[in-house]
Amino acid sequence: MSKPSNTPPLPKDGERNILITSALPYVNNVPHLGNIIGCVLSADVYARYCRLKNYNCIYICGTDEYGTATETKALSEGCTPKEICDKYHEIHKEIYEWFNISFDKFGRTSTNSQTEIAQDIFNKIKDNGYTLTQEIEQLYCEQTCKMFLADRFVEGTCPHCKFEDARGDQCDGCSKLLNPTELINPRCKVCSKPPVIKSTKHIFIDLPQLQQQVDQFVETNSKGGNWSENSIAITNTWVKGELKPRCITRDLKWGTPVPMEEFKDKVFYVWFDAPIGYISITAEYTNEWEKWWKNPENVKLVQFMGKDNVPFHTVIFPASLIGSKDNYTLLNNLSTTEFLNYETGKFSKSRNTGVFGDGAKATGIPSEVWRFYLLNNRPESSDSIFSWDDFNFKNNELLNNFGNLVNRVLKMLNTNAAFNGVVPKIGELNEVDKKLVQEVDEHLVQYFQKLEEISLKEGLKIAMSISKLGNTYMQDNKPWDLSGKDNERCGQVLAILINLIKLLSTLLEPYIPSLTDKVHQQLNVEPTKYSTHFDINAIPAGHEISKEILPLVKKIEADDLKKWRTKFSGIGPEFPIDMKIATVLEVNDHPSAENLYVIKLSLGGDQTKTAVSGIKANFEKSQLIGKKLAVVLNLKPSKFKGVLSEAMILVADDGQATKESLSFLVPSNPQSIEAGSKIAGKGMSIKPKPTIDYQKEFLHYDLTCIDKIISYNKSQLFINQNEPLVSEKIGNGKVR
């Protein structure tokens, strides 16, 4: 009953029409648990609640696909931005499906609808006089790339906290927003060369002209929309005093084109463009999207996001819509979360720290347990920390409180010969029964109040408190002792508990829908909408429950907890090979062997090594000079016809024994990689053995080339933990 409609709902006069959005996840990585609880999962609970209340609602989300992060990710993986977006859109979609996220539409921003709607909003803002153009100083890569560097194409030292790998738009060390020109010792992310400062013309949204309208919007909607204190504080840092013009264009190719001849080589900045994705994704869902997005009188817009996204949704996006003067539906309710951190620090895919969506699935723990844990620990007012001990504690709470209540009651009804799985008559209630009904009804009032306020964590606690009331009622009335002695009272207790379980399955459906589906199956009933009171006859006497009663939740074993804590701690498997990128300086014929080259390699700075290699039949000298390629440096040095070889050049071999059978292993983007750069799998601990015997050890390592991707023990190898190592020519083969 909390699932989306088969046909797109539209707003209706006289009904509650709620438009729900979750912050659009970016497509440059896999979502971690903090991303999931901060946006899509929280919005999913509220959307399911609204459907169970018979509110007219839709839940819209999708991948945010334009901007510098996509272009830089595409460079690092050696593919196009479109290919990156396709890949990560599917990854996100699969993870959210596994987590049972009930979008009405999960779309993407790289669509024609996005271009049309974003350009239309911009043109209206411009025509209404709310834009201006200014020349700004911007970093330009003059040595290699010959292009202006948008924010994420620049890295350097943060001027505030001195973090050395701050991005041009924000520092990951102190979270402060930055301009690229503020960085100390900036460097181009593509080629690592220092850029210069040049002037370039950009378009700004003239926020000072919109100040009064934005102030009024914030004043009215922050109070009426239940914004958190932190969200209001973050917004006020922007609007208190005086708003400043905000640049809305970037020197990029991957994005929504600016519809002006003078700026035809520029695209819209992601934080002007991305929130419009909510609108364009709705337009992909229904042709009548304007009935949702241009209907502020009848539609409430409820948006979910992490605290770092607040100012773009409370200032930039509303200001853009106000400036268009096109009667857009503006943000009403804002539900934000603080940060969820991992027990050993921040989530990091590259360092294998923390649980990401794909990792959660790989544990084999059902998604409902993850949902239950995350929603119990939703960081609503302060940052929270994921810990495996607490995860185990919450799993036991779900098992012992709700899971055992369902299992005990249904099994007792099935195994008692007096009932044989058929719900008994309840008859007249005694004072104990009436007290239970009264307490449950009081809890229901609180439950609905908290869900209306979008206090999701409190709503879950209240539902579990009702389950606890059921357990206490069962313990106090001891139906196992009544069986055979007073079957009428035994049946009455079980029938009341059966109906309490049905009520609980509806209350918990927004939180753990797959698990409550199982409860409905075992009760042999269809899901229903909410009831505002405890109906003890919702499942009538004479109804037969399922004969197959299975445990809903399993205990987590201590050994599994230990295994997962180690797996996600950032302590990866050891990589025993000293593998680096080298640049070929010289290639000479071996003085005593016709089939060998003697190759001089640079490993950065003044460090050089000599490699004697049997690749002469496959490559001309001219094909090697200046090439950046992978080498192994900890093989036992060997003499070949009197010449000492200190390194081995790696190749992929397709086994066909032709001149084209060998392929060098190279960076996917050689310009960005320096000689001496280390190679290993992400999250691996690089611990080279002092020496490796080629015949006895190296040939037995699982080094493979599949679809040009180089892997060790089925883990992809990267240069500097970021740049993929790939085969230059052949697609599949053995690495040697």
Swiss-Prot record:
Organism domain of life: Eukaryota
Keyword annotations of the record: Aminoacyl-tRNA synthetase, ATP-binding, Cytoplasm, Ligase, Nucleotide-binding, Protein biosynthesis, RNA-binding, tRNA-binding
Keyword Hydrolase attached: no
Motif 'KMSKS' region, residue range(s) on this chain: 346-350
GO biological process: methionyl-tRNA aminoacylation
Any one annotated GO CC term: cytoplasm
Protein EC: 6.1.1.10
Keyword Cytoplasm: yes
Principal subcellular localization: cytoplasm
Binding residues for ATP: 349
Motif ('HIGH' region): 25-35
Enzyme type, top EC level: ligase
Family matches, as Gene3D superfamilies: HUPs, Isoleucyl-tRNA Synthetase, Domain 1, Methionyl-tRNA synthetase, Zn-domain, Nucleic acid-binding proteins
PROSITE patterns: AA_TRNA_LIGASE_I, TRBD
Pfam families: Anticodon_3, tRNA-synt_1g, tRNA_bind
tRNA-binding domain boundaries: 573-680
Catalysis performed (reactions): tRNA(Met) + L-methionine + ATP = L-methionyl-tRNA(Met) + AMP + diphosphate
GO molecular function: ATP binding; methionine-tRNA ligase activity; tRNA binding
InterPro entries in UniProt: aa-tRNA-synth_I_CS, Anticodon_Met, Met-tRNA_ligase_1, Met-tRNA_synth, Methionyl/Leucyl_tRNA_Synth, MetRS_core, MetRS_Zn, NA-bd_OB-fold
NCBIfam families in the record: metG, PRK00133.1
PANTHER family according to UniProt: METHIONINE--TRNA LIGASE, METHIONINE--TRNA LIGASE, CYTOPLASMIC
Family (UniProt): Belongs to the class-I aminoacyl-tRNA synthetase family.
Protein name as annotated: Probable methionine--tRNA ligase, cytoplasmic
Organism for this UniProt entry: Dictyostelium discoideum
Organism placement in taxonomy: Eukaryota, Amoebozoa, Evosea, Eumycetozoa, Dictyostelia
